[in-house]
Amino acid sequence: MKRLTKILTRTVAIVLTLSLMLGIGLLFYASIVMRGDRAAAISAWQNPAVSITSTDHSIVLTPTGAPSGAGLVFIPGAKVDPYAYLFKLTGIVEETGLTVVITKPTLNLAILDLRPLESFTADAPDVEQWIVGGHSLGGARACQIAGEADVVGLVLFGSFCANDLSNSQLTVLSIGGSGDGLSTPEKIQSGAQLLPASTTFVEIDGFNHADFGDYGAQSGDGESRLTSEEARAALTAELLGLFGAG
């Protein structure tokens, strides 16, 4: 009996130690974030057509002109600074009056963020119609919450779904880049069967995975042939097809 107790005690101690080490390892991994480009963020903050506010849950981009009544909850890619997306997303706010809510994922990992959609939509209570979207793994998380009642559409930014939405009535736009070395055009097409048949697929020439934000080069990515300004203009042009011109 004493021997069994000793074995159980040792086993529990080992399990607790391993769990602690894994937890510390996860925290360390998540703490290494791809920081947003300062100049790009400053440009976004200085845009007179867009008002930017920060809450505990998100960063909210609202038009200073007439709002369209539509909103996009945007989920960042894994370990990417949410502020890295400001410059690229202000384009569609400026052009259409769209409201954009960029989430601040738990531990900078969207897959660990299980907060409901209303945690973020509450930061923009005047929006009447919601679309969800995200970059890379953030897009995969957006797919998971796209079935919520208030959601009418989904935008995938260099991403693809892991869950089946093929029978949904969602309006879906999938934006990829010819130079994306992570969510390659082939990977995006291989996941097409999980999306509605009416999904619109677009591929921006010369655009890579990191072009969806402004956070520098990303390991494993392809080369971009565009400046940040050119990438922003190209992305905005594709989003206009879904959100319309203001």
What would you call each of these model-derived segments?
Residues 168, 173-176:
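Short beta-strand/loop motif that positions the catalytic acidic residue
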Residues 133-142:
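Gly/Ala-rich beta-loop-alpha elbow adjacent to hydrolase catalytic centers
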Residues 2-51:
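N-terminal membrane-anchoring alpha-helices
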